[in-house]
């Protein structure tokens, strides 16, 4: 068993304000996405300007925050927020949903595409590789907060988390950081470094994230108020990942089909 480091969730204070690690991780994720996007935009023939990147990141920030909070409200704590509607605005108390944030970003991308005259999937393919660093930062923030821990385990790397009882648990936040953050970024960044048919990068993101998250859910403790939703093992996270996996397969399939048709026309 490995001893949990027991971090202070407050990174530092500025007068009366407590600056928390989790909030800093969100900022770090947005800054990383912005820097990576600008590096891609500066390449010859990218079709993007740094001004467009700045606007895209601004749209995406609002999409992540609003979508993530509303998604958590609808998917995980509906009854609580119906009884306490004003608490929806208390983001500093925690409670964000990746799947809600994803929907928020998709809406933001659609609005940005309409504003700039770009196609939805042109923007989506450009954005997809930029998401993983934010996921990495967010999962590290969960680990620092000692939240969203895993199920009980007898593995040597099990940890006893504060408030999670005396038994060691999987550090599932770190599993997610490794798969949804590091592995997903490396795969998508390298995959998108070469010209790909439209929808391919977006489809790969949906397929890979959905698959990684579905797998890690087997090690992650389900939300106490939800538990398992089907067959004694299916979690809300897995249910929400299924449309991502299916959607990713469809997009990759369309991308491959369009690539073959384009190749035939040039012969």
UniProtKB/Swiss-Prot annotation:
UniProt keywords (A-Z) are:
Cell inner membrane, Cell membrane, Membrane, Transferase, Transmembrane, Transmembrane helix
A GO molecular function term, named singly, is:
phosphatidylglycerol-prolipoprotein diacylglyceryl transferase activity
Q: What is its EC number?
A: 2.5.1.145
* GO CC term (a single one): plasma membrane
- For the keyword Transmembrane, the answer is yes
Topology within the bilayer: Multi-pass membrane protein
Q: Which residues cross the membrane?
A: 17-37, 56-76, 91-111, 120-140, 173-193, 199-219, 236-256
The record's subcellular location field reads:
Cell inner membrane
Gene Ontology biological process terms from the UniProt entry: lipoprotein biosynthetic process
Binding residues annotated for a 1,2-diacyl-sn-glycero-3-phospho-(1'-sn-glycerol), in chain numbering: 139
- What name does this protein carry? Phosphatidylglycerol--prolipoprotein diacylglyceryl transferase
What species is given as this protein's source? Oleidesulfovibrio alaskensis (strain ATCC BAA-1058 / DSM 17464 / G20)
Q: What is the lineage of its organism?
A: Bacteria, Pseudomonadati, Thermodesulfobacteriota, Desulfovibrionia, Desulfovibrionales
The UniProt gene name for this protein comes to lgt
């Amino acid at each position: 068993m490995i001893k949990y480091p027991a971090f202070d969730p407050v990174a530092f204070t500025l007068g009366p304000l407590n600056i928390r690690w989790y909030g800093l991780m969100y900022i770090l994720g947005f800054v990383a996405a912005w820097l990576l996007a600008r590096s891609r935009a500066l390449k010859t023939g990218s079709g993007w300007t740094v001004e467009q990147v700045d606007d895209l990141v601004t749209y995406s920030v609002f999409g992540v925050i609003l979508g993530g909070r509303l998604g958590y409200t609808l998917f995980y704590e509906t009854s609580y927020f119906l009884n306490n509607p004003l608490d929806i605005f208390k983001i500093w108390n925690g409670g964000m949903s990746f799947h809600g944030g994803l929907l928020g970003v998709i809406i933001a991308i659609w609005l940005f595409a309409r504003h700039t005259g770009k196609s939805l999937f042109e923007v989506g393919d450009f954005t997809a590789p930029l998401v993983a660093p934010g996921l990495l930062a967010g999962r590290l923030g969960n680990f620092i907060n000692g939240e969203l821990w895993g199920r009980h385990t007898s593995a040597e790397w099990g940890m006893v988390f504060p408030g999670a009882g005396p038994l060691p648990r999987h550090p599932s936040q770190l599993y997610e950081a490794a798969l949804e953050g590091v592995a997903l970024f490396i795969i998508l960044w390298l995959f998108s470094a070469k010209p790909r048919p439209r929808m391919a990068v977006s489809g790969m993101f949906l397929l890979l994230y959905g698959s990684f998250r579905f797998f890690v859910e087997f090690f992650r403790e389900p939300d106490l108020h939800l538990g398992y939703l089907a067959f004694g093992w299916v979690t809300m996270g897995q249910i929400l990942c299924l449309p991502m996996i299916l959607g990713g397969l469809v997009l990759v399939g369309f991308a491959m089909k369009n690539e073959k048709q384009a190749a035939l026309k040039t012969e």
